[in-house]
C-alpha cells in the first residue's frame, strides 16, 4: 500500500528547514516532475557503492531510496556527492534526499531526518602484523599511532575526540584514500 502521507513526512523531514512551504513546494516539484533526486557518495559499501563499469549504484541505501521512489510513483536520480557536502547538497537543492547521514546537532540545524533505519557499531581495524600493539581504545590514543577516517563524517569528529594524541589522517574518498 502506498502511504503518500508518510512518504511526504519523510521528505519534509529530509529537506531544508526553511519552512513548511519550502518543503511542500519541494514535494510538489518531485511529484510534478516525476523525479526524486538522491545524493549519494557511492563509496560506502554495503550501503552505497558505484559500479565503475556500469556507473550504476547499488547497496542498502540505494535499495531504500529506490523503494521510496517506487512508492511515490516517481523515477529516482542518483546525484554523486561526497561526505563533507552531503547535507549541504540537500540545503542547496542539488538533491532532495540522502541516506546514511548520521544525526549530528550541526546537521540538524540545516536539514531534517527521517526515523533511523539502521544502527552501526564503530570498530577500529588494523593489519594482522600490528594487532599485538593494541589492547583497547586507549592504546590507539598515542603519539606515533597512525589513524585515518573519512573527512566530513561523524567518525571525523569522534576520531578527533577519542584519539587526539594519534597522527590522524583525513581521507576525502574512502575508495581511494585507504588503499
Q: Where do the model's predicted regions map?
A:
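Flexible hinge/capping segments at coil-to-helix
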Residues: 128-145
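Bacterial N-terminal signal peptides that target proteins for export
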Residues: 1-8
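Ligand-binding cleft/hinge of the Venus flytrap
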Residues: 48-54, 65-74, 136-141, 154-173
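Sec/Tat signal peptide C-region and signal peptidase I cleavage site
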Residues: 18-23
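Ligand-binding "clamshell"
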Residues: 52, 106-120, 165
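Bacterial N-terminal signal peptides
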Residues: 8-16
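Short Pro/Gly-enriched coil loops immediately N-terminal to beta-strands
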Residues: 112-126, 142, 161
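Extracytoplasmic small-molecule ligand-binding "clamshell" domains
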Residues: 24-101, 109
Amino acid at each position: 500500500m502506498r502511504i503518500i502521507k508518510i512518504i511526504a513526512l519523510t521528505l519534509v523531514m529530509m529537506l531544508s528547514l526553511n519552512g513548511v512551504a519550502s518543503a511542500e513546494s519541494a514535494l510538489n516539484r518531485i511529484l510534478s516532475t516525476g523525479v526524486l533526486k538522491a545524493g549519494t557518495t557511492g563509496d560506502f559499501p554495503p550501503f552505497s557503492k558505484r559500479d565503475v563499469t556500469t556507473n550504476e549504484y547499488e547497496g542498502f541505501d540505494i535499495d531504500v531510496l529506490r523503494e521510496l521512489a517506487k512508492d511515490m510513483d516517481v523515477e529516482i536520480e542518483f546525484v554523486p556527492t561526497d561526505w563533507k557536502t552531503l547535507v549541504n547538497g540537500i540545503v542547496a537543492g542539488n538533491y532532495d534526499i540522502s541516506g546514511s547521514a548520521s544525526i549530528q546537532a550541526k546537521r540538524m540545524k540545516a536539514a531534517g531526518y527521517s526515523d533511523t533505519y539502521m544502527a552501526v557499531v564503530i570498530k577500529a581495524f588494523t593489519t594482522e602484523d600490528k594487532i599485538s600493539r593494541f589492547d583497547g581504545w586507549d592504546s590507539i590514543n598515542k603519539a606515533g599511532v597512525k589513524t585515518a577516517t573519512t573527512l566530513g563524517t561523524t567518525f571525523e569528529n569522534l576520531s578527533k575526540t577519542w584519539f587526539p594524541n594519534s597522527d590522524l589522517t583525513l581521507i576525502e574518498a574512502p575508495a581511494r584514500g585507504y588503499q
